[in-house]
Amino acid sequence: MIPALARIIEAGNLLHGAKPVNCSFDFGTELAESEIEYRDKTSPSIDVMFAAVDREALFRAFATEPVAGEAGIPIWTTTPWTLPANEAVALHADLEYVLVSGEVAGQETVLVLARDLLAAVTDRIGMQGVTELASAPGSVLEHMRLSHPFYDRDVPVILGEHVTVEAGTGAVHTAP
């Protein structure tokens, strides 16, 4: 293959441009962009809880009294295979986050969610008896420590402009 590529280069037939030239191997012709069809791919999506290492600090950040239940920040991802490599959970500094309590799968749970995604997330995970405890900007949670969901190690909460409320929970799992 390399000798064949060398001959193409020597003949001056290899050009560097801004767009690829798509070819049909069946017909031996170039294809226009309008002739290219992409296969739809459905990716799995999951919600994963990152429990607060210091749950009291989580309640202090929201200036509210602690309540019963596991407390943490859930993330939503369409790339679950990257979770083992997770190094942080990102929030947006200026988004409003709510601290809510309720029951998930029969367990009292306290979650941090972007306000704009509250209804969508609680519906998706089947949270019952949702009570809003407090709200705060994401910036108050910077540097908080969360437990990695699979490994015996902590990950920090960081701030990122890439975090949006288009889908998910308002928290983005971050892996290299």
PLM feature segments, named:
Residues 1-176:
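NTP-handling and nucleic-acid-processing catalytic cores
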